[in-house]
Amino acid sequence: MSSYENHQALDGLTLGKSTDYRDNYDASLLQGVPRSLNRDPLGLTADNLPFHGADIWTLYELSWLNSQGLPQVAVGHVELDYTSVNLIESKSFKLYLNSFNQTRFDTWETVRQTLERDLRACAQGSVSVRLHRLDELEGQPVAHFHGTCIDDQDISIDNYQFTTDYLQHAVSGEKQVEETLVSHLLKSNCLITHQPDWGSIQIQYRGRKIDREKLLRYLVSFRHHNEFHEQCVERIFNDILRFCQPETLSVYARYTRRGGLDINPWRSNTDFVPATGRLARQ
C-alpha cells in the first residue's frame, strides 16, 4: 500500500465509484490528483525535481458532432508537462471525453482548443493536444522499444512485494557504460481500485553497469504495488538515480489502454526524446 493511498485529496474522485455517463459536454467531469502526493514521500518538491518529462496520453475513443450533427472521430495525442500541479485522473478523463459524444462543435480546431483549455485548467500546467484523422494513422506499423530486453532470465522469484532492496549494491565496477534496457514485465495496480496496470518500460542510462537480474527483480516487485502510472515511473526514476547513481538516466513506460486511453509517462535528466509509436500490447 502506498503511504498516501487514503489521503483526503483522493476522497472526491469518481474512480472506484458508481458513475452516470453524460454525453453532453461538461468540463467539470475532469479531476486532478496532486503530484505532490507521491513526490513528497520521495523528498521531491517543485523546485528540486531531478528530472523533466511529460505524461503522453493517446485518446482512442474521441467523438463529437459537427455543426450539422454528423459524428466525427479522431485519435488524440495529449502531452501533459511534468511541472503541472496535478496529474489527470484517467476515469474522469474518460467520462469527460464521453461528454463530447452528443455535443456539436463547429470545427476540429475548436475541439482541440477545448481539450487543451480544459486539461490545462484541471492540471494547472502546460498541456498540448493534437488530433489525428484516421487516415493519417492507418498502416502505421506496431513500434518496439529500442534496447536490450532483460526479461528472458533463468531466475526464480517468489516475492512480489515492492522493495528497493534489489537496487542496493546493484552496480559493479568502475567502468562507465551506456545502455538501454527494456522490460515488458512491469505490472502495478491502480491506486484506488487496485485493478492491474500492464506496461513496458525502457531504461536508458550512462554510468556504472546495473545488474540486470537485480533490476528485473526490482521491476517485478511492483506487481502488488498500488500507484498511478505516472507515480510508478517517477518512483522508478528516483530509486535508480538514488541507488545506482548514473550520470544520466531516462525512464519511459508505455501502458496498455483502459477505457479508450493509454498513458505513457517519461522522465529524464538528459536530452531524451521519447518514441511515441504504440507497442504490440497497445
UniProtKB/Swiss-Prot annotation:
Binding of substrate, residues: I88, E89, S90, H229, E230
Major subcellular site: cytoplasm
Taxonomic lineage: Bacteria, Pseudomonadati, Pseudomonadota, Gammaproteobacteria, Enterobacterales
SUPFAM superfamilies in UniProt: Tetrahydrobiopterin biosynthesis enzymes-like
InterPro entries listed in its UniProt record: GTP-CH-I_C/QueF, NADPH_dep_7-cyano-7-deazaG_red, QueF, QueF_N, QueF_type2
Molecular function via GO: preQ1 synthase activity
Gene: queF
Protein name, entry field: NADPH-dependent 7-cyano-7-deazaguanine reductase
Keyword vocabulary terms for this entry: Cytoplasm, NADP, Oxidoreductase, Queuosine biosynthesis
Species of origin: Salmonella paratyphi B (strain ATCC BAA-1250 / SPB7)
